[in-house]
Design a protein with these regions (language model features):
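N-terminal helix-loop segment corresponding to the beta1-alpha1 unit
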Residues: 1-129
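Short "domain-exit" segments at the C-terminal end of structured domains
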Residues: 130-135
């Protein structure tokens, strides 16, 4: 039996809980989700539900829950942006949020992504916040 989103590809350029949960829902629906992280990893890797320190290299339970069923790739913002472009070219949607070194690069802001990849559905998590300081 096929899942509702089989064949749908999402590139996850988000950080934090909201973007992680959004893309988890895509993955749970059968979409192929690729989580893109800078070498230092998503800041969420070091979060714990209790507030106790977590080894970011191992990842905490919250990150593991949100990253379940996703592929993960590491991209160095200073040299591997072509890898991100290749992922975007083959995707159907991208989930973006400010807060990571990768997502905060001008070339990876939602408007710039849409200019280069008009076929993509580009979601910007900041749209749900009032008085956002991000463009």
């Amino acid at each position: 039996m096929n899942a509702p989103l089989d064949g749908f590809v999402v590139v996850d350029l988000s950080s934090g809980i909201a973007g992680g949960y959004c893309t988890k829902l895509f993955a749970d629906g059968g979409a192929g989700v690729v989580k893109v992280e800078a070498p230092e990893g998503d800041p969420l890797r070091a979060w714990s539900a209790s507030g106790a320190p977590v080894d970011a290299a191992a990842g905490g339970a919250l990150f593991s829950f949100l990253a379940c069923s996703k592929r993960s790739v590491v991209v160095d913002p200073e040299g591997d942006l072509q890898a991100v472009e290749d992922l975007l070219a083959g995707a159907d949607a991208v989930v973006w949020s400010a807060g990571s070194r990768l997502a905060d690069m001008d070339s990876l802001r939602p408007q710039r992504i849409h200019e280069r990849h008009p076929h993509l559905v580009v979601t910007d998590r900041k749209s749900t916040r009032l008085n956002s300081s991000h463009d």
